[in-house]
Amino acid sequence: MSDQIKFIVDSLNKEPFKKNYNLITFDSLGPMQLLQVLNDVLAEIDPKQDVDIREEMPEQTAKRMLNLLGILKYKPPGNATDMSTFRQGLVIGSKPVIYPVLHWLLQRSNELKKRAYLARFLIKLEVPSEFLQDETVADTNKQYEELMEAFKTLHKECEQLKTSGFSTAEIRRDISAMEEEKDQLMKRVERLKKRVETVQNHQRMLKIARQLRVEKEREEFLAQQKQEQKNQLFHAVQRLQRVQNQLKSMRHAAADAKPESLMKRLEEEIKFNSYMVTEKFPKELESKKKELHFLQKVVSEPAMGHSDLLELETKVNEVNTEINQLIEKKMMRNEPIEGKLSLYRQQASIISRKKEAKAEELQETKEKLASLEREVLVKTNQTREFDGTEVLKGDEFKRYVSKLRSKSTVFKKKHQIIAEFKAEFGLLQRTEELLKQRQETIQHQLRTIEEKKGISGYSYTQEELERVSALKSEVDEMKGRTLDDMSEMVKKLNSLVSEKKSALAPVIKELRQLRQKCQELTQECDEKKAQYDSCAAGLESNRSKLEQEVRGLREECLQEESKYHYTNCMIKNLEVELRRATDEMKAYVSSDQQEKRKAIREQYTKNITEQENLGKKLREKQKAVRESHGPNMKQAKMWRDLEQLMECKKQCFLKQQSPASIGQVIQEGGEDRLVL
């Protein structure tokens, strides 16, 4: 209990309370002062509890504190009967009740602050089921539950952000930088608006630019969707290939293997899996649980200093030495009996370690095989993306090689044919050049003949006329085809329009009927809604009146209950004071001297006489000190002068005894002397 009180006093003297208590002053606090201290601690956890209990009824104070302690999940010691005493002790400010509560609150104040904060938003309001029959109340209650769930998720995200390393200073700097950037952008936008307003049709151009931006955003969104679908397709292809490879390997194994080998392999797999499940995994799980238990234990304990760690290390070393001594003693006692058993144990431990090592090696090999298969799958997908082909394996590669050989022979033949064609092409090209040269000479001769005859340019004009007539015939043919196509297109469009009209006629007729029906239903709905609103308003007014009456009656009931409990507490306090007064009167009136000595009056009178005698002695002592003060000061001064005189004589004597003064004549105030 003393450690508990010491912890409470130390905590109350620190921030944010700064009470400046010690053990005696804290122990001498009255019930109301203790309750005020408890209320201050609760107000530090939940700011809504910051009230002066002198301005509050005791029952209301106890009810408020009990409600908050219930929210904070404080469990009073004892059973149901102790709960009533706990409530009563909380009302009257009993120390055995208040001290454990203060100790519990001050030990985990940060955790309780968080719990009190969450309780403001996560304690669900109980709505009676008859009120939930109303649709408005039900919708509001549903919205309230959804907001509560949203608060839970937001609080989790907030805690994750707090633990993720982001500091508020960095966020504030980012916000200030964003605000500056926002101001700059607003200024730029204003300048651009002023520049754009001078341009003609700027509204239309802004509208087009807005549409362009929307379309670009839509294009980016579609590109993102396309990329996501590509990724999904890629993953689906990977899964498909993985499953196909598994199926192929299983078919290959089933085709090549016999039932005996399959059974043997299955038995080996079953043995390995059973060993992993029954021996290896439970051991690892047990070790992880122990490690977790130790870590939780370390986290729950308070932080240790260097001295505590040194003390724990010394204890661990002592325990290890004791264990080693006990093991040596046991081995010395049981060495002749358990010699063979220790050998067998060593062999069994070696075998178990080898078994565990092989199991781990097999597990690592399986993981490595799986990673290699994933890598092969990635490489095959990359090759497929690059050139659209797949990596061949086994028999497929052999077939590919044989096919490649046959294609190489065909390639050689085709290459030979191409060489022949190239040679023939060279001959034809040379023939073409010769014919062009011959044509040029003939054209030159023709032009000279035309000049001689006086009809120069006749051949050129003839060629141009032929070329233009050919072009005109081609254009006329194209025009005719275009007109035919246009007429056919018009016919098709007319037929489509007539078909759509005939198809939409019953739909339009049905739509008219539905519109008429919709108007009737909306009119009926408006009438029903008006009736509902009037009825709901009447019921709401009645409900509000009833709620006010119930609220008033509850407040009266609470006031009467608080008065009743306060009266009971005052009666008990008066009974205690009356009992003490009667005991005092009995002791004072009693003829027995022992009883009289126990009386408080006698004790106080005795203390008063003792203090008076002590004061008288002290005054006499003070008088004696005052009388002897002057002579004592004079005597002290004389002693100091004597000490100075003796010190001066000592210095003179030391000078006389020094060797530097031998053979010198020393002349002082009295006589002349020769020191030999």
Swiss-Prot record:
Coiled-coil annotated spans: 133-258, 306-388, 433-453, 497-628
Example GO biological process: intraciliary anterograde transport
Modified residues (Phosphothreonine): 61
Comp. bias (Basic and acidic residues): 613-629
Effects seen without this gene: Mice show impaired spermiogenesis, abnormal sperm morphology and significantly reduced sperm number and motility. In addition to oligozoospermia, spermatozoa show dysmorphic and non-functional flagella.
GO cellular component, one term: intraciliary transport particle B
Family matches, as InterPro entries: IFT81, IFT81_CH, IFT81_N_sf
UniProt subcellular location: Cell projection, Cilium; Cytoplasm; Cytoplasm, Cytoskeleton, Cilium basal body
Ranges where the record places region CH (calponin-homology)-like region: 2-121
Coiled coil found in the keyword field: yes
Domain of life the protein comes from: Eukaryota
Subunit structure: Component of the IFT complex B, at least composed of IFT20, IFT22, IFT25, IFT27, IFT46, IFT52, TRAF3IP1/IFT54, IFT57, IFT74, IFT81, and IFT88. Interacts with IFT74; the interaction is direct: within the IFT complex B, IFT74 and IFT81 mediate the transport of tubulin within the cilium. Interacts with tubulin; the interaction is direct. Interacts with IFT57 and IFT70B. Interacts with RABL2/RABL2A; binding is equal in the presence of GTP or GDP. Interacts with IFT88. Interacts (via the IFT74/IFT81 heterodimer) with RABL2B. Interacts with CFAP61.
Task of the protein: Component of the intraflagellar transport (IFT) complex B: together with IFT74, forms a tubulin-binding module that specifically mediates transport of tubulin within the cilium. Binds tubulin via its CH (calponin-homology)-like region. Required for ciliogenesis. Required for proper regulation of SHH signaling. Plays an important role during spermatogenesis by modulating the assembly and elongation of the sperm flagella.
Family label: Belongs to the IFT81 family.
Protein's recorded name: Intraflagellar transport protein 81 homolog
Organism lineage string: Eukaryota, Metazoa, Chordata, Craniata, Vertebrata
